[in-house]
């Protein structure tokens, strides 16, 4: 938006910059991948369908922030406001960089649209959620073993275990956006996956 490019052009622009930097340092890759490919889309959608078939995904109608000036629902990073936990004035719609708390855009105090600084309104939209609580036990076992084998940093271990101790909550994995990985489920054709659902899958899909 700030650079006046389409989403696809911006993605290509930074892909070329990253690639040229590695080339300048004489670093080469068997495959220098990205998540905006048909290959990644197919794998991300397949993983979602398996999660959905196994009962880890559910539908829920929620209130979201909508900018009447921009005429669209606002993605997490397009909303800023006051953190309800530490009162940091420039917290984002997904997290507060001061206290580290994960947030939902509707939790922000005095929310404002990052594009035009106006106050967004609440509108209802139906989304898909991943029921992380169902996976808590398996995740704890995995973290206990993988953090040792993978030599995780002390900070990574403490943050992860803090989230597990506090209890995992359902997380919305879809967004009312046009750019992204399409959701392969009837009734959700106009939505895409939240980036933090499909982007980590890229680490797997690039090696497939």
Predicted feature residues:
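N-terminal Rossmann-like or analogous alpha/beta NTP/dinucleotide-binding catalytic cores
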Residues: 1-60, 68-72, 84, 141
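Structured secondary-structure scaffolds
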Residues: 33-35, 39-43, 86, 95, ...
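Cys/His-rich short segments
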Residues: 55-128
